[in-house]
A protein has these predicted regions:
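Short glycine-enriched nucleophile-adjacent loop
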Residues: 152-163, 169
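Catalytic active-site module of serine/aspartate enzymes centered on a nucleophile-bearing elbow/loop
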Residues: 325, 331-379
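Catalytic-loop region of hydrolases
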Residues: 1-48, 379
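Short beta-strand/loop motif that positions the catalytic acidic residue
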Residues: 303, 309-311
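Alpha/beta-hydrolase-fold enzymes
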Residues: 171-266
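N-terminal cap/lid subdomain of alpha/beta-hydrolase-fold enzymes
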Residues: 33, 37-107
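Short alpha-helix in the alpha/beta-hydrolase fold that links the catalytic acid
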Residues: 291-296, 319-330
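Conserved acidic catalytic loop of the alpha/beta-hydrolase fold
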Residues: 113, 117, 124-143, 157
């Protein structure tokens, strides 16, 4: 049975949060979910940062959509991140649409949905809000923090901003700043949304409608970038969609067309168009080096966190080189870092899929870090 957004777990963050744009928010909701139990020694907490279109429902069943959690392949009883053993925390980012403060919420100044009056947010703003959740849950230091894609960006920002908050960290398939190609793809998605007349300069929420066509196209753009060329060719090739020959029309003749349309229009039922604008903007603004006067090494100074950086060989959205650049900076800063490139043809989305080598690597690192963290806390 579906739950309503109003009924999900959330805290009200009362202390003011000064945003990078100069504005301040306070008394705002931050929605979250936890899995497993925090043990008596409080040495088993793992914070998961979600990606662009994710949410706090990491595993099990999402009570809003009735679909599987977005990382059910990796998180759950007996899985790589074992919820019988670890206490897993995940929050919906501010700017999102699954219960945390976002552009579809009511602006107290006029009792209308924020729309484009919502302040522009950054990855750093997201992370600072989530640190308040750890305070609420009584977690002073995490066993591990992890996340893929935008989740990995949040993780890097978290470690730079709060260098003593995590014993270990696993950034997955991410980058320390958005490339021109990343920005271009996000701009294409935003323009698709804004070109939909229903978008109406972000005011559609007050009319109880959604710019479905624009949002669906934005999602299609994303899905292309999440796959690899080889993986897409092997999965679809030029195969037709339930027909023997071309229709000589603009219907979905090819399986790949049908796939993109399905993914696009299924997405509009669970996500807010303005949230895509705000979150992709936060990703584009992310540049950890810029925050530290052009030096990524400076961002990671004074780190006691133990890092495992993971990339995927066929990921062209956040390439192996970009992930290796993070490793180089961590090494140069004196941080404890290891690196693993997973060989796969499944592209950027590999971290969400059942990739045995990836899951084995994830589990091995977390379990070994738990033993070290327990020993450290005994001293």
């Amino acid at each position: 049975m579906n739950r309503k957004i109003e009924d999900i777990n959330k805290i009200i963050v009362k202390k003011p949060l000064k945003l990078d744009c100069g504005k301040t928010i306070n008394n705002f909701p931050l929605a979250y979910e936890t899995y497993g139990k925090l043990n008596a020694n409080k040495d088993n907490a793992i914070l998961v940062f979600h990606a662009l279109t994710g949410d706090q429902f990491v595993t099990g069943t999402n009570p809003i959509t009735n679909k599987e959690g977005w990382w059910v392949t990796a998180v759950g009883p007996g899985k790589a991140i074992d919820t019988d053993k670890y206490f897993v925390i995940c929050a919906n980012v501010i700017g999102g649409c699954m219960g945390s403060l976002g552009p579809k919420d009511t602006n107290p100044e006029n009792n209308q949905p924020y729309g484009l009056d919502f302040p522009v947010i950054t990855i750093k703003d997201m992370v600072k809000a989530q640190e308040s959740l750890l305070e609420h849950l009584g977690v002073k230091k995490l066993l591990c923090a992890t996340g893929g894609s935008m989740g990995g960006m949040q993780l890097l920002q978290f470690c730079a901003t709060f260098p003593d908050k995590a014993f270990s960290a696993i950034p997955i398939a991410c980058s320390s700043s958005h490339s021109a190609q990343n920005i271009a793809l996000n701009e294409l998605a935003r323009q698709a949304i804004m070109a939909d007349p229903v978008w109406d300069n972000g005011k559609y929420v007050s009319k109880n409608v959604q710019p479905k066509n624009g949002l669906a196209v934005a999602r299609m753009v994303g899905h292309i970038s999440y796959l690899s060329e080889k993986g897409m060719q092997e999965k679809f090739g030029r195969k037709l969609q339930e027909k023997a020959d071309y229709e000589f029309s603009f219907n979905a003749d090819f399986q790949v067309e049908s796939y993109l349309r399905h993914q696009g229009y299924a997405f509009v039922e669970r996500f807010d168009a303005n949230s895509i604008l705000y979150i992709t903007r936060a990703m584009d603004y992310f540049d950890l080096s810029k925050q530290y006067n052009g030096g990524l090494v400076e961002a990671f100074k004074n780190q006691n966190t133990k890092f495992l950086v993971i990339s995927f060989s066929s990921d062209w959205l956040y390439t192996t080189k970009e992930n290796k650049d993070i490793v180089i900076a961590l090494n140069a800063s004196g941080a404890d870092v290891s690196y693993s490139e997973i060989i796969t043809d499944k592209g950027h989305d590999s971290f969400l899929l059942n990739e045995p080598e990836f899951l084995k690597t994830l589990k091995g690192f977390i379990d070994s870090m738990h033993e070290k963290f327990k020993n450290e806390k005994r001293i």
